[in-house]
Structure formats: C-alpha cells, structure tokens
Amino acid sequence: MKMTKTYLLVAIALLFTSTSFAELSIKSDVIYGHKDGMALVYSVLQPENANGAAIVFMVSGGWFSRWSPAQRYASRFDDMLDAGFTVIPVHHGSAPRYRVPEAYADVSRAIRHIKLHAGQHGIDPDRIGVTGGSAGGHLSLMLGMDSDAGINGDRDEVMRNSNDVAAIVAYFPPVDLREITGPNDRFPALDFEPAKAAAISPILHADPTDPPILLIHGDADELVEISNSVDMQAEFEKQHITSEFVTIPGAGHGFRGEDATQAAAMRLDWFKRYLL
C-alpha cells in the first residue's frame, strides 16, 4: 500500500509538471564554449507569449555554479516567464576549480554567444538584461560595467560579438574584491593573485555609459555587508548612471518569504521598464 501511494504521488507530480511546462519551450544545455575538455552551458526558457526581451540569470553563489535541470528555473522565474521574458540561466566554470576572473570570462563569453545566436533564440540582442545574487550579483554588475563592442579580427566568431547588456538587477553583490581576495576555505574562487582584483571589482568600473542598474540589499546581511551597495550606489550617482538602491529592512543574505517576493516584484518592474 505504501508503494502504491508513492507511485501515485509521483504520477500526480509528473502530470502537474507536464501541465506547467506545456506552453514553455526549453532548450537545455546550449554549449557556449569549452574549458579543460568540459562544456560551458546555458539553457533557454521561452514562454509562448515571448516579448523578444531576455533576462540572463547568473547561476552563481560564492562563484560556485552548480548545474540543475533547466525545468527548475521555470518555477523559480515564473513571474518573468508570465510577463513574456525569455529566461536564460548561465553556468560558468565553478569553484573550487576555477577562480573569479575565470568565472567572469565565462559569463562574458556567454553573453557574446547569446547575442550571436539571438535569432535562433527568438530574442532581440539589444534587449538583454542580467540578474543574480551575491556572486551572481557581482558578475551581473561586471557585465554591465566592463562591456565592449566585440573584439574585431578575433579568430573566434563568438568573441567578435558585443557583451553589453541593457539592464541589471543585482541582489546583495560584493563590489570591491581587493578587500577579500586571498586564501579562503569557504570561497576558494577568491584565492587568486591580488593584482587581478581591481580588474574585476565593479566599484572601479562605473562610467556614464553603463546601463540602468537596480541594487537590492538587506540591512541585516552579515556575509556581504550593505555597505557594498551603499558605496556602489554612491559611485553610480557620481557617474550619473540611471540607478536605484533599495534596502530591505531586517533581511539577511539570501531573501526569503515576503522579502523574496518584494525583491522579485521590484526586479520584474525594473526589467519591464528598461527592456520593453
């Protein structure tokens, strides 16, 4: 009897899963490059009512980029999909093997690849936003502040494409890696040459050409202190960059419950405002 109930629950779960994704097109594990013989991948989730804009999600926490089935992102980002956005979760070379500079190089390449194949993905290459939290927020900011129009003459077709983005939403991002680079048991991706830290510290790269940026941070964050976003917003204002900074009172690192709902609503509104 117990086994029968288990099978019944599994069957019901599969039924609802199939129903939920019936109007969603999913391309899983699109290869955008290779590293040490391993594929670098992203997935493309496109709703039936696609509006042509895309939101790229940085799959990164502590610069660990753990693979998950693409279908899991359908429920995580159902608000974006319902609004017609194509959602593209990107995986980079993960800690502990790879360091932050390598992770950034990977996601930068991913944006170029997405733009190169924008027609195949049914998106407008000029209406791509990017978002992430913590390490993913850091990578999102770097993509907005360290972009170029493509590397002319590069033998790699992907690298000849731009890596710029049109809007950014970053949750609780570390913005100055000069202060935290070095041996680190918890976050091994930070163990790289200190001389490279400035090149991947968003606080040092803001300029008036940067896209609109929304920062969301909890004032009870003990891992990435809110001063990171305070300082980043001050730099945005100094550079006259279109930006907003929202503090969520009492929220720690990683929004949950009502805090997560509130942050997601603000994120969606930002992308509607600047991508549509």
Where are these regions (language model features)?
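Short beta-strand/loop motif that positions the catalytic acidic residue
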Residues: L215-H217, D221
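Short amphipathic alpha-helix adjacent to the substrate-entry channel of hydrolases
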Residues: P69-I88
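Mobile cap/lid helix-loop segments that gate and shape the active-site cleft of serine hydrolases
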Residues: G144, P173-H205, P211
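N-terminal cap/lid segment of alpha/beta-hydrolase-fold proteins
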Residues: E23-A50
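Primarily recognizes the serine-hydrolase "nucleophile elbow" in alpha/beta-hydrolase
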Residues: R112-T181
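C-terminal catalytic histidine-bearing segment of alpha/beta-hydrolase fold enzymes
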Residues: S43, I226, V230-L276
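Short beta-strand element of the alpha/beta-hydrolase
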Residues: G52-G61
